Amino acid sequence: MEKQFKHLSIFTMITLVALGCQTPQEDLKVSENSRTYQEVWSEFFNERNMEIVNEQFFTDDVTVVIPDNNIVGIEGTKNYYGNFLLGFSDAEFTFIDIFGQGDKLVKHWNFKGTHDGDFFGIPPTGKSLNLSGTTLILMEDGKIKQEQNFFDNLDMLTQLGLME
């Protein structure tokens, strides 16, 4: 009985290690996806280049998952994220960390800026925003297919002086 348990334990450990390891091809895919993703969003936010949201880097049916109604398509995605550039003329976007497996990436980010323009219909408050969050990303054939952002909305609204 003890011998069987020992063999089962060894088999279980080997299986878990094997399942948790990525192949060199998977590592390369994650690396390429991460590089592309970081280049696109750094160019968008820090160089203020909205035109980089295009069919070269995004699937036609790219989806931004949001609570009320998902944003679908390249133009919708460009307009959605464009609100951050319109609302914060000094927007500064930083990647804190990015990692992944296969076509899935996770991004930890920070966004800073002064609310000096229209932001999703909110008139300028002149307040500074320093917001961190996490994004789940799905890539397809080296293109961005889906994003879902997680951040503290109450903290954002409080920093903008809209909530107490």
Task: Please annotate each region the language model reported.
Residues 21-56, 60, 163:
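Short, low-complexity N-terminal intrinsically disordered segments enriched in polar/charged residues
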Residues 9-18:
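Bacterial N-terminal signal peptides
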Residues 1-9:
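Bacterial N-terminal signal peptides that target proteins for export
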Residues 103-115:
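A short hydrophobic beta-strand element
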Residues 113-141:
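Exposed beta-sheet edge and beta->alpha loop/turn motif
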Residues 145-164:
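Low-complexity, intrinsically disordered terminal/linker segments enriched in charged
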Residues 35, 50-105:
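A solvent-exposed, acidic/Ser-Thr-rich amphipathic alpha-helical stretch
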Residues 98-106, 138-145:
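A short, structured loop/turn motif at beta-sheet edges
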